[in-house]
């Protein structure tokens, strides 16, 4: 799959997620087969005001390329200037956010609010595309609400503006992340434009991904919440695309090793205090569905140092292995 002049190793992308898709997590997903990773959304105004924390979000490691930086805002001139900054900083692709449903973003006329203003969206995308040489992409929703499903119209305008690819989340802004994604909207977008289309929404397994490709005809898959705590979904999907249909069951030890590694990467990237704070949430996602997960998620939220994290993980490993061994013995006796 190709976006402009950027060749992807696989037609599977990591969706931008605030508080999740920072550099460490993007590297992990890339190592597990993801073809394109996208940053957390970055404020165009923050870049223009030279905010240090905002500029930190532009950092890209060589091993995660190709990588896209996602911008948000609503002022065409500001976004064009911000796009130039992102390009100069070394991004491979610039993505534009038209999907965020959060009130503080929408109330500023940004994110999914732009689904209600097609002409402004077109002007923004045209100015961004004209201002840089690297590909510009956009992520949209099905529409504002069920009475205003306009993703195909927005997609056509985006293509006209010079956008190189488009990702479509099959939910409206009104839905947030509730209910079901309407994959038929993704199909209509694919039928409307010639540029590559990523389908997004309700892809939690490889089977979901294969079904979306078949039902919508989309060119690629964009995985968001399905990768949260489960970056192995990229390996599973790529294996499925290559003909292996079995679900990849991630062993407990592999999950715990990933938590340890992710914590170390966060520490190296952001320092121990922030790393531990952010890893509480990540660890909870990694442990979802594991034995005694609820109890240990609660205890993880009380941790303050990497040393405490390591000690609790060692305790959990021992207790979980005992639990699984006892369960195995019980099942053997029952047979």
Task: List the model feature ranges, each with a label.
Residues 12-16, 37-39, 67-71, 94, ...:
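Hydrophobic faces of well-ordered beta-strands that scaffold small-molecule active sites
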Residues 17-19, 42-44, 72-74, 99-101, ...:
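Active-site beta-loop-alpha junctions enriched in small/polar residues
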Residues 31, 80-110, 118-195:
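Alpha/beta enzyme core
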Residues 8, 12, 18, 23-24, ...:
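Alpha/beta catalytic cores of nucleotide-metabolism and tRNA/nucleoside-modifying enzymes
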């Amino acid at each position: 799959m190709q976006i402009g002049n950027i060749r992807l190793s696989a037609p599977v992308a990591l969706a931008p997620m605030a508080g999740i898709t920072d550099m460490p997590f993007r590297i992990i997903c890339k190592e597990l087969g993801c073809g394109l990773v996208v940053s957390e959304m970055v404020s165009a105004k923050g870049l223009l005001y030279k905010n240090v924390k905002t500029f930190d979000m532009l950092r890209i490691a060589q091993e995660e390329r190709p990588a896209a930086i996602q911008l948000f805002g609503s002022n065409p001139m500001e976004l064009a200037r911000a796009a130039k900054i992102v390009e100069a900083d070394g991004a491979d692709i610039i993505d534009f956010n038209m999907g965020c449903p959060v009130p503080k973003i929408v109330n500023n006329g940004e994110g999914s609010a732009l689904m209600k203003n097609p002409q402004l969206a077109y002007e923004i995308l045209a100015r961004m595309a004209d201002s840089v040489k690297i590909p510009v992409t956009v992520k949209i929703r099905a529409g504002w609400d069920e009475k205003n499903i306009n993703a195909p119209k927005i997609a056509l305008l985006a293509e006209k503006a010079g956008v190189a690819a488009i990702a479509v989340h099959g939910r409206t802004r009104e839905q947030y992340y509730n209910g079901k994604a309407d994959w038929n909207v993704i199909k209509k977008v694919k039928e409307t434009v010639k540029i590559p289309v990523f389908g997004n929404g309700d892809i939690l397994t490889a089977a979901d991904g294969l079904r979306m490709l078949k039902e919508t005809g989309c060119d690629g898959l964009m995985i968001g919440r399905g990768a949260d705590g489960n970056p192995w979904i990229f390996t599973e999907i790529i294996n499925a695309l290559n003909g292996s249909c079995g679900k990849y069951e991630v062993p407990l030890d592999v999950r715990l090793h990933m938590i340890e590694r992710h914590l170390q990467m966060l520490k190296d990237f952001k320092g121990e205090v922030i790393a531990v704070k952010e890893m509480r949430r990540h660890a909870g996602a990694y442990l979802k569905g594991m034995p005694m997960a609820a109890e240990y998620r609660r205890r993880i939220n009380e941790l303050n140092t990497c040393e405490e994290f390591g000690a609790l993980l060692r305790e959990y490993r021992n207790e979980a292995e005992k639990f699984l061994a006892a369960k195995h013995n019980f099942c053997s006796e029952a047979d």
